[in-house]
Amino acid sequence: MTCPCAHSRFRWLRQFCSMLCVLVGCCSVPTRGAQDLDKPLLNIDEDITAFAYAPDGRIVYSVHRNFKTKLYDLEHDDIWLQEAGGKRRRLLEGQKFNRGNLPFSYIVNSFRWSPNGRMILAELLTTTVIDDSGKTQDSFQTLLLDDGGKEIRIAKGDSVIPDAADPFFLSDNLSINCLAEAVKPRMLFSLKATRLNTGSFQSPHEGRTFRDLLPLPGANSAIAVEQDHSQTGPSRLQRLDLLSDEHQELATLDGYEGGLSVSPSGKKVAYFIDKEILEVRDLASPDHLARLRIGLGVFHWSPDESRILLKRSLEKKSGDLVWIDLPPLSAVTLGHAVPVSQPSAISILHGLTFRDFAISPDGRFLAVVITGKRSLLVFPLPQR
């Protein structure tokens, strides 16, 4: 609210008003940050279901679309590409995307780019009608597209990998690894592999089960949280060579609640050991770690890895965004208690809530999906 006396022609009245406002906090002046929220660098005014930055800063995103058939109301997301110069191209018209004779709906859950920035892996959550009674079956599938919208057919076959979640390319831009459900629903996963030119093949880590797995940037290896199939033993942090069966156990975890994330340099890893505490660990010296009490949420690393940007809610749920400074990692002796810090949370974007967010690869921009209509907005990355 702007003070009614702020524009008075009497200087003494303006000064008195200013002093009174400071004392009682009754009036405020719009801040630069508020103006910035009204003027994003980019506004994609659509119902966004997922998005991801390409290595060069382009954005692939999916848009919620419904259409009717004679028997069913179906959902088939469109997929679009936002070019750096401002141009937008539709890569996939969802209504025209079909497989087999059974009706199905899908939403895009996530995207992953190839290292060369030319191919896109779209993880689809599908619901298929499997009989005349209307019984349905849910599954994960991965669709392969190039950045021109052409479907990429594996070994001249289909462009869809069935039963494939959290897919990613290896550094050769040819091999793909993904997760298949080993214990439903999404409790444990096995690793499956395919190549664009030859098709699927047995993973070197066949028979092992994982709670989570992420590739290391620029390497043919991954960090995984392994759990035995019976789920009776502890979770173990492993480094896997994805081209062989070689592996290195990094640590036995006190707990695992999700959120596995590898830092941009590939030198650190972070994850929640329970619903409150985040553990950050050095991958070169796994006994060097830190614990922070920040509450369960979704986070991304700052470019310099000195802090994280945390959305204080679960994935696909709305929450506010806060910066969390990371403490130095220190050596911890096995069997000794690990100290837990309680860092301050620095709110950004006026504490508004967002459904999804991502930091651009160059660390300059922040993309957010707003709560409600779910438009995609891009701002300069707020520092504080």
Task: Show where each model-derived region lies.
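N-terminal secretory signal peptides that target proteins for export/translocation
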Residues: 1-12
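Short, surface-exposed loop and linker segments with low hydrophobicity and enrichment for Pro/Ser/Thr
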Residues: 14-17, 361-362
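Bacterial N-terminal signal peptides
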Residues: 16-25
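Sequence signature of WD/YWTD-type beta-propeller architectures
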Residues: 29-384
